[in-house]
Amino acid sequence: MTGQGQPAAGSAAWSTVFRHVRYENLVAGVSGGVLSNLALHPLDLVKIRFAVSDGLEVRPKYKGILHCLTTIWKVEGLRGLYQGVTPNVWGAGLSWGLYFFFYNAIKSYKTEGRAEQLEPLEYLVSAAEAGAMTLCITNPLWVTKTRLMLQYGGVVNPSQRQYKGMFDALVKIYKYEGVRGLYKGFVPGLFGTSHGALQFMAYELLKLEYNKHINRLPEAQLSTPEYISVAALSKIFAVAATYPYQVVRARLQDQHVSYGGVMDVIVKTWRKEGIGGFYKGIAPNLIRVTPACCITFVVYENVSHFLCGLREKKVS
């Protein structure tokens, strides 16, 4: 009897969650993710190249962010600065759209029937759940993006440049490495959901505390400068706490080196490069992700409020 009741209860819970989904969150998240990534993709390219720079001769040597950007521009041109942009835009748009979509549905489900706001831990868990669900769908796009970004222009061995584009990379990775190849970096990626969870928790709490401080309703809409400030602070906090996993994931997904797994990457990076190896690329990453986060959240908040306003007008 108990065994029959559990699936029924589980499906009832899921149907309750899906009752809270709103397409507005999906559309607004996609809009923010796409716009921010189109604007700042070259800095993401720099971050990836620094993250995997471990002394191999096959890789170009970069002295800093500007040197990296100018070298890529001279050798590969504008196209070089936008290597991997297609899967990045697809991945970022889909990731942000699904993240906001799942997160708001889970959050609405948890707040249904209660007057008080969620506790910090509840925000953290809700965002982690949304992140894990999103990663299950989008990980192949992130593997593809990394592979395309690591096709260096001017490389002597032409075999190092084996992908013609996003779909070619997806097909070849699946053909030669199977599903496992498309999900390389998935485990550190799951740990990476802690980044999004910490960011969303900080973002929600900062919004609530700020509105409380200036005597506004907890869910009151902020101005654009206020959204920018809150988003920037939450992003810097999350990056400082979780950056090393991004280096581990990038190295696992790199086609030039073969690692035995997450622990193999961690041990080898620590032995060869020390603690600094886990923070390679953090400067260009912070320069990129902070404004990217601000663009994403400002676009998301404004588009979602606009679309939700249209929904309310239709209902009334």
From Swiss-Prot:
UniProt-listed GO biological process terms: folate import into mitochondrion; mitochondrial FAD transmembrane transport
GO terms assigned for molecular function: FAD transmembrane transporter activity
PANTHER family with a match to the protein in the record: MITOCHONDRIAL NICOTINAMIDE ADENINE DINUCLEOTIDE TRANSPORTER 1-RELATED-RELATED
Effect of mutating residue 300 to A: Significant decrease in mitochondrial folate levels. Does not affect glycine cleavage system
Pfam families named in the record: Mito_carr
Keyword Transmembrane helix applies: yes
Keywords: Membrane, Mitochondrion, Mitochondrion inner membrane, Repeat, Transmembrane, Transmembrane helix, Transport
GO CC term, one of those recorded: mitochondrial inner membrane
Role summary: Facilitates flavin adenine dinucleotide (FAD) translocation across the mitochondrial inner membrane into the mitochondrial matrix where it acts as a redox cofactor to assist flavoenzyme activities in fundamental metabolic processes including fatty acid beta-oxidation, amino acid and choline metabolism as well as mitochondrial electron transportation. In particular, provides FAD to DLD dehydrogenase of the glycine cleavage system, part of mitochondrial one-carbon metabolic pathway involved in neural tube closure in early embryogenesis.
Effect of residue 192 to E: In cell line CHO-glyB; results in auxotrophy due to deficient glycine cleavage system; no effect on its mitochondrial localization
Localization (cell): Mitochondrion inner membrane
Protein name: Solute carrier family 25 member 32
Consequence the record notes for mutating residue 219 to A: No significant effect on mitochondrial folate levels
Consequence of changing residue 200 to A: Significant decrease in mitochondrial folate levels. Does not affect glycine cleavage system
